[in-house]
Amino acid sequence: MEGRITQVMGPVVDVDFDSYLPAINEALDVNYDIEGHPKKLVLEVAAHIGDSRVRTIAMDMTEGLTRGTKVVARGKSIEVPVGEQVLGRIFNVVGDVIDGGDELKEPVKWSIHRTAPTFENQSTKTEMFETGIKVVDLLAPYSKGGKVGLFGGAGVGKTVVIMELIHNVAFKHSGYSVFAGVGERTREGNDLYHEMKESGVLDKVALCYGQMNEPPGARNRIAFTGLTMAEYFRDEKGLDVLMFIDNIFRYAQSGAEMSALLGRIPSAVGYQPTLASEMGKLQERITSTKKGSITSVQAVYVPADDLTDPAPASVFAHLDATTVLNRKIAEKGIYPAVDPLDSTSRILDPQVVGEDHYKTATGVQQVLQKYKDLQDIIAILGMDELSEEDKRVVERARRIEKFLSQPFFVAEVFTGSPGKYVTLQETLEGFKGILEGKYDQIPENAFYMVGGIDEVLEKAERLKANA
């Protein structure tokens, strides 16, 4: 099952086999030397181009490759380690450990190309997934086995929200998480690893990185590497796993690069003609089965803030909820900087979350929307010109805004205030009370950076004593 390289075009390599034709997605190994240093390269078959020749995508840089170099077919696709051993470690696309630690001891390996669960194995019941983050649980709740898009620019706190979710899943649901860095900056990946180490969540998460400087094959397939690790925990261990993909746009982008190099005719805006089916192939595997679930949070970069761009548009079709981070909210010092009016969820429906939750959430949104509408009047004429009714709305909206902030466990190191996990019951009680006017006499400051409503009352007492 040996072949020879006949052509190298950047990350695309053509290989000629004499008596064997490897299947699509089969892995091929190349061992060669660069200036006396041995190098191992993995290729993946992407197309058959006639006469027992195949066109492949390289999973690493191809410098130093020459025509005539020997290639060995594996007879199977890329396989990566799965199971408890992968927790706390960093892997590359082909499943090699890249954190400088010891190699894994005889790990179980699974192929990264797997079929999505069949209809009969999928679970159809919609359950809410409690995150312990007030603004998310109240206004844009996540569903178990659902897909969430996390939208935000640079520096508004996407990574901190991701780390807090990993923390809460690890400690409250005693579950595991998998993080796939797709086209990540190496620095960000490095920071994330060290921050997780410091905040004590590293031993509950597996990290897979395909960085920005790597060829498109590695950046594309890394999403499957991470997903395969998550699928093992779901299917073999029956767990509810959290899967993070940062950034899903880079998955589509790397597919576009590969498509052009493989000689396919580009589609709208230069993207690959197979964009929708490639996205579907990945997203359909992220689902709940009767054994367990994979809930995914996907950071979405929106090129030039254009939501109609084919790449983000292809993601929208798959999302159940969107969490939008807003710089203006971050500037007010309200963290997490989730936009309560822009974030949406498919399960914010009385039939799923119940009448009580639905009424409270819509009540909060109405008050915040009214406050937003009144802001121009306040800016020009001041608060005194408002009617008594409007003044009351503004005061309650400001309390709600402050109460939507929350101290995070993973930010304790920086803020000095202990993190808080707020149950859905506490969240609903607090916001219902504010809407009903129970806490109109309590100063606004008491609502800022606390957990449940009991803490607001304690903080108000402290403020009173210090006054």
Swiss-Prot record:
SUPFAM superfamilies given in the database record: C-terminal domain of alpha and beta subunits of F1 ATP synthase, N-terminal domain of alpha and beta subunits of F1 ATP synthase, P-loop containing nucleoside triphosphate hydrolases
Gene3D superfamilies named among the record's database cross-references: 2.40.10.170, Bovine Mitochondrial F1-atpase, Atp Synthase Beta Chain, Chain D, domain 3, P-loop containing nucleotide triphosphate hydrolases
Membrane topology: Peripheral membrane protein
InterPro entries noted in UniProt: AAA+_ATPase, ATP-synt_VA_C, ATP_synth_F1_bsu, ATPase_a/bsu_AS, ATPase_alpha/beta_chains, ATPase_F1/V1/A1_a/bsu_N, ATPase_F1/V1/A1_a/bsu_N_sf, ATPase_F1/V1/A1_a/bsu_nucl-bd
Location of this chain's protein in the cell: Cell inner membrane
UniProt KW keywords: ATP synthesis, ATP-binding, Cell inner membrane, Cell membrane, CF(1), Hydrogen ion transport, Ion transport, Membrane, Nucleotide-binding, Translocase, Transport
Annotated positions binding ATP: G152, G153, A154, G155, V156, G157, K158, T159
Cellular component terms per the entry's GO annotation: plasma membrane; proton-transporting ATP synthase complex
Self-association and partners: F-type ATPases have 2 components, CF(1) - the catalytic core - and CF(0) - the membrane proton channel. CF(1) has five subunits: alpha(3), beta(3), gamma(1), delta(1), epsilon(1). CF(0) has three main subunits: a(1), b(2) and c(9-12). The alpha and beta chains form an alternating ring which encloses part of the gamma chain. CF(1) is attached to CF(0) by a central stalk formed by the gamma and epsilon chains, while a peripheral stalk is formed by the delta and b chains.
UniProt protein name: ATP synthase subunit beta
